[in-house]
Amino acid sequence: MNKSYIIGASGLIGGSLYELLKSKSLDVYGTYSKNNEDNLIFFDMNKSDFSCFNKVEENDIFYILSAYSNPSWIAQNKALAEELNYKSTIKFIDFLNVKKAKIIFMSSVEVFDGSKGNYSEDDKPNPLNFYGQTELINEKIANIYQKILI
C-alpha cells in the first residue's frame, strides 16, 4: 500500500486532510515545522534537508500544503516568503520527482484577482499580491512534472 504524506499537517487545511485520511485507515504521515503536534514529523522545508523522506517509494503520495500564507506578512517579508513559498518548494518537488512520488500541490485562490469567483483551471490567473505571485510561479513550474496535480 502506498503511503500518503501531508506536508503542513499542523495547519488548518493540512490538519483536516491528515485527520480525514487517518480516519480512512490509510497509511498517512504528517509534518510540522512550527506547531508541534503528536504523531507529526518535524520537517523544515527551508533547510532543504529531505533525509526524513529517503525511504519514500515510487507512487507514494505527497500533499504539499506548507506555505507562508498571510498576504500582509508576506508583503513585509518577501525574501523569507519567497524562500519557502517558491524556492524550497521547488527543491522539494525536484527531490520527490527523482523518487517518482505522486505530488498534489495545493495552490491558492490568491493566484486570481477575485473579480469572478468560482475559478477553474481554465481561468486566467492575475495575482494581486506577492503570495499569489509565488503560488503562480509554483504552478507554472510544477506543470512540467509528470506526476503532479495542482
Question: PLM features: residue spans?
Answer:
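Active-site "gating" loop of Rossmann-like NAD(P)-dependent oxidoreductase/epimerase domains
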Residues: 68-72, 76-80, 108-129
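N-terminal Rossmann NAD(P)H-binding glycine-rich loop of SDR-like oxidoreductase domains
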Residues: 3-24
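Short, polar loop motifs at secondary-structure junctions
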Residues: 9, 28-37, 133
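Active-site YXXXK catalytic motif of short-chain dehydrogenase/reductase
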Residues: 85, 131, 135
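Hydrophobic positions on the long internal alpha-helix
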Residues: 88, 92-96, 142
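NAD(P)H-binding glycine-rich loop region in Rossmannoid oxidoreductase-like domains
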Residues: 45-84
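Rossmann-fold cofactor-recognition segment
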Residues: 33-50
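Conserved beta-loop-beta element that borders a ligand/cofactor-binding pocket
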Residues: 102-104, 108-110, 139-150
